[in-house]
Amino acid sequence: MSQVVQSRRLRAIDIGKRKAEGRKIIALTAYHAHTAGIVDPYCDFILVGDSLGMVMHGMESTIPVTLEMMILQAQAVIRGTEKALVVVDMPFGSYEASREQAFLNASRVLKETGAGAIKMEGGAHFAETVAFLVQRGVPVMGHIGLTPQAVNTMGGFKVQGRGPDDERRLLEDARAISEAGAFAIVLEGIVEPVARAIASSPRVTAATIGIGASAVCDGQILVLEDMLGLSERTPKFVRQFGSLRTHIEDAVKAYADEVRAGRFPADDHTYG
């Protein structure tokens, strides 16, 4: 008698298992059902990032992004995927005021979207909030280093970890967030020696996910549009694995030329 194998969506605990097994963790951002569906078979988790404010809406930073925007796009990503864990960014102003505020908004995200985890930026000062959420059933991914929501206080998008004080701070941030119960931590814009120290620390049991933090991390994440070559400008740490911007421009130009010349729609595209 044949046995039916029941597939299921990955969970936060599976990310930790990949770290324990030494398997690299693959992640990308997605904001739409169709793009999420394309990347789903290849990713361990998909991040519905607050970067959608800049990528989708042309905002200058992630600061104006609202909880409602995050929920709407996360719902789309869930509908378009079957396999990957879906993680949703908590936007600026949705978790900083108190642990209670963080739980109310995080639980709303999970209930209204069906996502499997939330991500929040911040270091050791948010460890109590992380523990509060985890103890109440909310899987949390941390995010330290270059934290875009703090761009106004950081003085811009600056590489982190240069200097002994910065190194100590980042190590303490990672240890505190991990020990509070985060299942993973995004390390963004961190110099390689510091990223290595974090990833190899016995006190950091959370999976480390790099974005501009070298190959020493347990996994990697990129903004999908950057990786595909759709963005006009990309950071140093991005490798463009495609050049879709050029292909799209060529396709749109060909379409416009065909319409102007009266060649589209042709008989094949016309109802008789």
UniProtKB/Swiss-Prot annotation:
Purpose: Catalyzes the reversible reaction in which hydroxymethyl group from 5,10-methylenetetrahydrofolate is transferred onto alpha-ketoisovalerate to form ketopantoate.
Cofactor dependence: Mg(2+)
Chief subcellular location: cytoplasm
Protein name as catalogued: 3-methyl-2-oxobutanoate hydroxymethyltransferase
GO CC annotation, single: cytoplasm
Gene transcribed to yield this protein: panB
GO molecular function, one term: magnesium ion binding
Domain of life (superkingdom): Bacteria
Signal peptide coordinates: none
Pathway involvement of the protein, from the record: Cofactor biosynthesis; (R)-pantothenate biosynthesis; (R)-pantoate from 3-methyl-2-oxobutanoate: step 1/2
Localization (cell): Cytoplasm
Keyword vocabulary terms for this entry: Cytoplasm, Magnesium, Metal-binding, Pantothenate biosynthesis, Transferase
Pfam families for the chain: Pantoate_transf (PF02548)
